[in-house]
Amino acid sequence: MKFNEYYENLNPEIKEYFKIISPHFPKFLIPFIESKTLMRLKDVSYFCGAINASSKVYNFKYDISRLDHSISCALHVWNFTYNDILTLAALFHDATTPALSHVVDYLNGDYLNQESTELNLEEYVKTYDPELFNYFKRIGVNI
């Protein structure tokens, strides 16, 4: 999926939130956002399954994807640092987490650190997204 298609279908409130975080959207992020690794996150809920729980306990206005969350983290970092590498680190911080990851972390006894489901990013990208891996190498960024 291309970034423009993702953005056109984005909830207007999330679009506004992105603009509040960083009035300038760093265009260098677009090829990374369009990668298989990150586009996968558009279908992974940020709420780790809580969106499907009782509406008496949770009353979310709408769902937010892990991709939305990752972009917002990158925009926060960009707004304060204007550092490409730190911004990419923020963008990719959830790249390898599976759906319901924090639920599985809890089942794994890792409810404090919530890292048991995270895979090594370099190995993940090398294996599942060689195009992105080669792009990182081409621009001289170590994962």
Question: What role is predicted for each listed range?
Answer:
Residues 1-143:
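Metal-dependent phosphohydrolase cores
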